[in-house]
């Protein structure tokens, strides 16, 4: 009897040790089709079509915490892409970190969402195509190898600061400073995210000496209704003496409402004409995405969406349309 009890106790020890470790993820895939048309001097110069089975951002992760006493906890997470097409490799290529959490807030180091990315609910679409999500305004969002502090919430208000070191260089990982705040009151919310970067290499031969971005999002979110409006301003000073100052303002809005198991949704984004040394350039754009989700259960949903994007106006423009259907399962 004693031997059986001891064996049972020993067998339970690994389970107890693993109790604070959570396996989670999302598998989502579908079929997308698109058609894009280039116009130059009023004439169609190129037409491109594409249809394919695509992964819509599948992921798998492990996270956990350990109670260190006196209200202090060690927290960690390892998350990676998990494409059903088998095109992803490596560990920790999504948000992955280790840190401490307590009454002071949360301090983490690793590959972390930028403060700007955490205001990204303005773009709620599951898509591979840039035409099926408001991805142009979302393009500056990134995950950075960085250190980040998030404050506790006081009367609905919380804040975050983040720093990415210069030696973690890359397209999105030049030396950068990030800050933001969140305010919640009932279903209403206001979010701000901003960043300042130095010596930012966008691509080969295009270097930015100073870059800053600011985004303000406001809206309402409860169990059924989601509505938000975002304004974003980017400003960059290039290292090249010619055309050294560039800026653009963008706006976006999203509206969704849940009817039983169905949630229809619509998003609109607009990019105003950018400036190069205070002169207008024709990089304005308009984008519309409409779609819906049908929940078979709390974990499994069907997705359908259609999108339209136009860059430029008049005789010189680019117009794209797209459609997609998919299936998503969370675990």
From Swiss-Prot:
GO biological process: monoatomic ion transmembrane transport
Entry GO MF terms: porin activity
UniProt KW keywords: Cell outer membrane, Ion transport, Membrane, Porin, Signal, Transmembrane, Transmembrane beta strand, Transport
Main subcellular location of this protein, as a coarse class: membrane
Source taxon at top rank: Bacteria
PROSITE patterns: GRAM_NEG_PORIN
Membrane topology: Multi-pass membrane protein
Gene Ontology cellular component terms for the protein in this record: cell outer membrane; pore complex
SUPFAM superfamilies to which the protein is assigned, alphabetical: Porins
Signal peptide: 1-19
Keyword Cell membrane: no
Gene3D superfamilies named in the record: Porin
Localization of this protein: Cell outer membrane
Function of the protein: Serves as a slightly cation selective porin.
Miscellaneous information on this protein: Present in outer membrane vesicle formulations which are used as vaccines in human.
Similarity comment: Belongs to the Gram-negative porin family.
Subunit: Homotrimer.
PANTHER family: MAJOR OUTER MEMBRANE PROTEIN P.IA (PTHR34501:SF9), PROTEIN YDDL-RELATED (PTHR34501)
Protein's UniProt name: Major outer membrane protein P.IB
Name of the gene: porB
């Amino acid at each position: 009897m004693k031997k059986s009890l001891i064996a049972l106790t020993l067998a339970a020890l690994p389970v107890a040790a693993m109790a604070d470790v959570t396996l989670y993820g999302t598998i989502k895939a579908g079929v997308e089709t698109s058609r894009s048309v280039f116009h130059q001097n009023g004439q169609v110069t190129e037409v491109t079509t594409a249809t394919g089975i695509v992964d819509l951002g599948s992921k798998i992760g492990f996270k956990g915490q350990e109670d260190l006493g006196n209200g202090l906890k060690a927290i960690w997470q390892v998350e990676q892409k998990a494409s059903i097409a088998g095109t992803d490799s490596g560990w920790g290529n999504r948000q992955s970190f280790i840190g401490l959490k307590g009454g002071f807030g949360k301090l983490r180091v690793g590959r972390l969402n930028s403060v700007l990315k955490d205001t990204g609910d303005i773009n709620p679409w599951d898509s591979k195509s840039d035409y099926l999500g408001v991805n142009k305004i979302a393009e500056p969002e990134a995950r950075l190898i960085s250190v980040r502090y998030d404050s506790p919430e006081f009367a609905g208000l919380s804040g975050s600061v983040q720093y990415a070191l210069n030696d973690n260089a890359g397209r999105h990982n030049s030396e950068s400073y990030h800050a933001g705040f969140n305010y919640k009151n009932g279903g209403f919310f206001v979010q701000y995210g901003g960043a300042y970067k130095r010596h930012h290499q966008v691509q080969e031969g295009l270097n930015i000496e100073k870059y800053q971005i600011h985004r303000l999002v406001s809206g309402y979110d409860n169990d059924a209704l989601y509505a938000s409006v975002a304004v974003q301003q980017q400003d960059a000073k290039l290292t090249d003496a010619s055309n050294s100052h560039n800026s653009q303002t963008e706006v976006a809005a999203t509206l969704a409402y849940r009817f039983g198991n169905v949630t229809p949704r619509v998003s609109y984004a607009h990019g105003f004409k950018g400036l190069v040394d205070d002169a207008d350039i024709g990089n304005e754009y308009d984008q519309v995405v409409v779609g819906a989700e049908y929940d078979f259960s709390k974990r499994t949903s069907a997705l359908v969406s259609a999108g339209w994007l136009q860059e430029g106006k008049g005789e010189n423009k680019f117009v794209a349309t797209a459609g997609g259907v998919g299936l998503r399962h969370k675990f």
